[in-house]
From Swiss-Prot:
Residues that coordinate or bind ATP: 15-23, 38
An example Gene Ontology biological process: regulation of autophagy
Name the UniProt record assigns to this protein: Putative serine/threonine-protein kinase R517/R518
Species: Acanthamoeba polyphaga mimivirus (APMV)
Stated family: Belongs to the protein kinase superfamily. Ser/Thr protein kinase family.
Domain Protein kinase as annotated: residue spans: 9-290
PANTHER family: PROTEIN KINASE DOMAIN CONTAINING PROTEIN (PTHR24348:SF70), SERINE/THREONINE-PROTEIN KINASE UNC-51-RELATED (PTHR24348)
Active site: residue positions: 140 (proton acceptor)
Organism phylogeny: Viruses, Varidnaviria, Bamfordvirae, Nucleocytoviricota, Megaviricetes
Enzyme Commission number(s): 2.7.11.1
Reactions the enzyme catalyzes: L-seryl-[protein] + ATP = O-phospho-L-seryl-[protein] + ADP + H(+); L-threonyl-[protein] + ATP = O-phospho-L-threonyl-[protein] + ADP + H(+)
Pfam families: Pkinase
SMART domains (alphabetical): S_TKc (SM00220)
This protein's UniProt keywords: ATP-binding, Kinase, Nucleotide-binding, Serine/threonine-protein kinase, Transferase
Amino acid sequence: MEIINSRYKMTDTVLGKGGFSEVFLGTDMYTDNKVAIKKINITGKNSSDIKFLNKLDFEIRTMQILNHPNIVAYYDVMKTENYWYIVMEYCNFGTLNDVIKFNKNKGISSLDLEKNTHYYLNQLRDALNYIINMGYIHRDIKPMNILLTKSISENNENNENTNYDRSNSLILKLADFGLTKKCSENEEDIMNTICGSPLYMAPELFFNQHYNSQSDIWSFGIIMYQLLFHDHPINATNYSQLKNGLKNQKINFPKNNMFSNYCFDLLSKTLAKDPKNRLNWSELFHHYWFIHWSEQHCPKNKSDDSNNKKIPDKSQFNEILSSTKSPLISLRQFGQLGQSNLSKFKNNGAINCSIDFPKYTNNFPSAVNQSIKIGLSGSSSPINIPVRNNSSKKINYDDIELISNGNIFPETLYGSISPVDSIINKETRNKTNNPSSLNLSEFVLSDYEI
């Protein structure tokens, strides 16, 4: 038992583990609600590893910015000499991996299985639509990073014999933003680091090709396949078999299931090995299976309506403009929030704003200090908010962040230049001399530059 910041009681119950962190069950003593507390070890080499600390800081700032019913909520962060503690929403109903096992063992009809799959993927689609519009790519989408919950009161109850059928109205929550990266609205924005979980990584990452945000669409397709067929589309038990299968094995769809043509169409187009033939995000979000098939077969229930109408407890704009502890936010994200989200929140105390700055669409001036004008509704004159870039040359405005409390935290890339085979060898060197013995279901690659 550990008391953190005189508010959170952290138990010894471990909810999950990572390379340098553990997630414990805790309680917010102010509200008596259960929370999840991620305890991150920053001792030893981590304490002086600027890239590690920048990555951790970026993960926290990303969680502070993202606010959506289908994303695990961020509550608080505390820092001590040896540990950082991130307090998050507690999800007590397992992960999407439990749904896959449930579908496999229940033996339900094809139609009910498709409805169940649709119920969860529709929520994942909403979460991904949100983070893409916010200018992020997740890069580690997998069932273990997709949590399930209900209301706070139900979350504080025992969840024995959980029914993962859609009738139980579980809410999906996308989690773990440790590998998340800012990306451009342009889907051709090229990534130059290898990361993710091999079983869910797109083929282009295995063969030293640059990739873009469509790699997450492949991960979406793998999850859809697993929900429907209870297995991975590539028959592999180790890394070498997986890579060979991605190169040479045709993805087959079992024919003994009577799923709709729209379901198969979406599945096959998300699992196109060539990213040029894969769906783009707009095509995924507006696919017939989500828009029209659901109207015929999946009428909305009460949880769907309440989930869609949920409004964040506070305006991110009010937090950014008024609080000295507000998170940094990139200029692009600030603009996207203003354009796409504020109209939904204006009855919740949010400000209505517009951004006025010169048309530096491709480049922002190289001067160290700049400011942008934010026009506030109900105000006769705009206010100026300082921005700063950390480059002596002209840079894309994605790299410019609003200044909060005088602090600048530039996002950095990190890792070693190495093809994926060498990375696998490096990561497994201390465990085994044979990378083929790698446990694919538990292994995660961090950022490695290509």
